[in-house]
Structures are given as C-alpha cells and as structure tokens.
C-alpha cells in the first residue's frame, strides 16, 4: 500500500471544542463549537520516560514511563467571538463557559489524502491565554494548555454533532471603535495591546495510571502591554502616582464584546522614544491587573 504525506490543507473539520460533563468525559450527545477562524494547532505528548541503568555495563537495562504523561496543546487563531477564550480568561466559579469546565478538543484530517481521521484530546484546560490587537490588523489569540489523554486517532466517525468551519469575519482592533481602549473612563488612541492570563495549572497524578487524575487551575496572573499615541500626561500621571485604574478594551462594539481589567498597576514605562522618522510619539507601558472579565 502506498502512502502519501499530507498538509494542513487536508483538514476536514477545523479544530473545535465541547464542554465535558466530568473531567475527561464527554456528555452523551456532545455538541462541538468552532474555536475561531482558521486555527493553527500543535499537539505534544511527553511520556516522561526514565532510563534504568544496570551495574557493570554501559547499556540501560530498560526504559520506563514514570509519572503522568504531559500532554500539551498550542492554538493560535483569529477570533470571530470570545467563546473559546473565556475558558482561559474568566475567573473560577462561573460554571459553564469558564475554566470550571474541562474541554474535549477535536479535529479531523484526510490521512493519505483519502481517509478521514479524527484527532481527539480529552481533559483540556487552558494555561496561558494571550489576546493581541494591533492597529490595521485582525485580533490574534493564542491559547496554550494541558490535557489528560490523547488517544490514538480513529478512522471511525465518533458520531458527534460537529461545528462548521467559521465563515464570520475575524475581529479587528478597529471593531472596538475609534478609541477601543478606555482607562478610568477616558478614551485613548491605542496602537497595540496585549493581555496575558496565566492559570498556573497543577497536574494531580493517580496511582496505577499514566494519565492525570485531574488538572486544576491555581492562582490567576494577568499581565500585558499597550501602546498609546502620546497626547496627554494622563498615563504618566497614573504611573507616577501608582494609581490603580480600570481598563476596558472594547473588542467589538457591534457584538458587545469587552475585556475589563480591574485594579490595574502600570509596572513599567517600556518606552517613550523620540525619533524624527517616527510618524507619532508612542508611550508603551507594561501592566499587571488584579482581575479580568471577558464578555
């Protein structure tokens, strides 16, 4: 039998997700949702192999799998909504649509350019979520996470209800209006902004198994950067007085999508550079926030 390599163009079902009824377990009739526009995804599996050495020889006696397998995933996509990103951003305790719920990730490709093959990862939780916006460009979201199990891909249709590939227009920075970022209620001409949310996942191993018993979030850390056209002394005053403003990033005014950062400390003025070739003076800041809420 001859085989042929395939590329990403052989994707049949783009990456999608469904909430699990309990950790690592899908409900009886799961309905999957699209992650976003043309997601790029990478899966990794590290069995944590350990060589066992033996006296009197340079060769190992055996190589064994030790702790729970480390299964990770890395997704980059252009959002058309905020559904998937909410799992990485919003606080615990909110139930469905938050990190309280673990996810199953699914996609399919035509292996050998012929046979549809389903790739499934169970028990997924996001660890790092980064949302980036730049003037004149689509928003980009990157989510890196961990999972409980990564079964051998199957060529038998699981029979789930699948999402169709997203055909909506990706969100751009301009979709938040002329001034999509406000700080303490005042609008600013933002040129770029990034919000990073770390969930510091902890893997709980289980005796007699190479799969994690559960992966749970711990402390949430919210950091980021932004650049503003220098027009007032407002932000330098906030930096100098160590004020803690509320920042609201309107991702899409039409869709009612916002990202609110509370008790925000400006941790650094990264740059305020003066060069004759620059079209405008930009003040660039780093910040850390106490809480974040994505709608």
Language-model-detected regions and their locations in the chain:
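Signature of extracytoplasmic/envelope-associated structural regions
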Residues: 1-295
